[in-house]
A protein has these predicted regions:
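Terminal, non-catalytic protein-protein interaction segments that mediate quaternary/complex assembly
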Residues: 1-198
Length: 198
């Protein structure tokens, strides 16, 4: 694939062009609709320490970094995100709370819900959890043991012990738990390739 040699932003723009020109129109759960392509892959060379952020659209990169750190922590509760001003995951537990508790036609606002999440640890524990989303799958993949499999620790150990392995992979797509997640993973499988010690 020639695009794999392109700068990350050029890969993204090329993908957007292909989706616009040849993508199939599809309906989605949000009612917005999409143009879709099947099986597209983007490859990023991270060996120089760069991060593939876009400059052609507004990116809330600080929130993205906070979210990634939250994933890597293994947490599944929105409380740490909300405490840092990251609201990207609030809608799912808020909708669940409103469906269970709000009087008809008077749901609690996002601001009021987030304030309760911050102020009340018990409320956050009950209503702020997203189920076994990214962080849980990455750090506690269920295997019958109390802590599960820490895919991130296993990945790092594998890269250090056997850099040439083709098995430097982790995933968030756990078919057995998709229905328990607030939202199934959008980005779900990652593979690392070590070449010449990098």
């Amino acid at each position: 694939m020639a695009d794999a040699l392109l700068h990350p932003e050029a890969q993204y723009l090329s993908l957007m062009r292909r989706a616009w020109e040849t993508g199939v129109e599809r309906s989605d759960r949000t009612g917005t609709g999409t143009r879709a392509l099947f099986g597209e892959v983007m490859r990023f060379d991270l060996s120089d320490g760069s991060v593939p952020l876009l400059t052609t659209k507004k990116i809330f990169w600080k929130s993205a970094v906070k979210e990634l750190i939250w994933f890597l922590s293994g947490d599944t509760n929105i409380r740490p995100l909300v405490a840092q001003g990251v609201h990207i995951w609030t809608d799912w537990p808020l909708a669940k709370y409103n469906a269970a508790n709000a009087p008809p036609n008077s749901p609690i606002s996002r601001d009021a819900f987030e304030a309760r999440i911050i102020e009340d640890a018990d409320f956050a524990a009950k209503w702020g959890d997203l189920g076994p989303v990214y962080g849980f799958q990455w750090r506690h993949w269920p295997d019958g043991s109390p802590d599960g499999i820490d895919q991130i620790a296993a990945l790092i150990a594998s890269i250090k012990a056997n850099p040439a392995s083709r098995r430097h992979i982790f995933t968030g797509w756990n078919v057995a738990q998709l229905d328990q997640m607030a939202l199934p993973p959008c980005h779900m499988t990652y593979q690392y390739f070590v070449a010449n010690g990098r």
